[in-house]
């Protein structure tokens, strides 16, 4: 992109700061910039700790959305999951019930392994959400949990078995440990499918995760990969089921 074109992009940029309904791991607001271009709107909102190379991919994704071209849509709607933060059981159940009844979600992803909480807290939260699913008479209900890399290998082995029981069967557990080596070892000792999320941040990461037998599923976020077109290439090369996820985006992102 030329300096002149970049100046045009920045001239049509609008900063934003949106409060989160529920704080997430110390984050209370999402801050970023909305780009307005001939193709629509793009969102540039990398996290503050990211380096320049990572931020450049997020910017490329935003520019693609505002100035580039996406592939034609293949469907008019896609299923989504409700997300339950690391809340107390009663609050988690109430939030889940609203997602099931009000929003029509059949699948819920529950945050676990929160700093300062225990496995007992996680088990109680999952049991409460499962009860809410049953009360809402959700057809073909599914429960996923997301540890955001918060467990050691030993803790993950115990926690996954307990949470699988509490859920009546987990669909999968997302990023239970931090490294691909830990995920690969964990896959050998638990029966619940493992999804890699934080381990997938560049185009080559899904391939490495599969080659190292570290994931049954890969979670793809578009901004870290540089845009929709690059993300499609990653999905095609992964060779395992893919879940497309957000990155704490606004309604634009």
Task: Give the ranges of each region predicted by the language model.
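Catalytic core of soluble alpha/beta enzymes
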Residues: 112-253
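N-terminal capping/lid subdomain adjacent to the active-site entrance of alpha/beta enzymes
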Residues: 2-157, 161-166
């Amino acid at each position: 992109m030329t300096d002149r074109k970049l100046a045009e992009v920045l001239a049509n940029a609008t900063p934003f700061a949106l409060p989160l309904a529920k704080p997430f791991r110390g984050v209370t607001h999402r801050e970023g910039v909305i780009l307005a271009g001939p193709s629509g709107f793009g969102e540039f909102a990398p996290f503050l700790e990211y380096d320049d190379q990572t931020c450049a991919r997020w910017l490329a994704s935003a520019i693609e959305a505002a100035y580039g071209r996406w592939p034609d849509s293949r469907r008019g709607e896609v299923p989504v999951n409700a997300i339950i933060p690391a809340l107390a059981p009663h609050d988690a159940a109430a939030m889940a019930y609203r997602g099931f009844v009000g929003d029509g979600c059949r699948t819920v992803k529950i945050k676990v392994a929160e700093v300062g909480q225990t496995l007992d807290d996680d088990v109680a939260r999952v049991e409460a959400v499962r009860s809410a699913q049953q009360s809402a008479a959700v057809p073909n209900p599914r429960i996923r949990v997301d540890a955001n890399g918060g467990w050691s290998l030993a803790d993950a082995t115990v926690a996954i078995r307990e949470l699988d029981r509490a859920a009546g069967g987990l669909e999968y557990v997302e990023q239970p440990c931090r490294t691909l080596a830990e995920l690969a070892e964990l896959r050998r000792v638990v029966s619940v499918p493992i999804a890699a999320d934080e381990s997938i941040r560049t185009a080559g990461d899904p391939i490495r995760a599969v080659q190292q037998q570290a994931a049954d599923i890969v979670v793809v976020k578009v901004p870290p990969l540089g845009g929709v077109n690059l993300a499609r290439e990653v999905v095609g090369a992964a060779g395992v089921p893919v879940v497309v996820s957000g990155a704490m985006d606004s309604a634009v992102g």
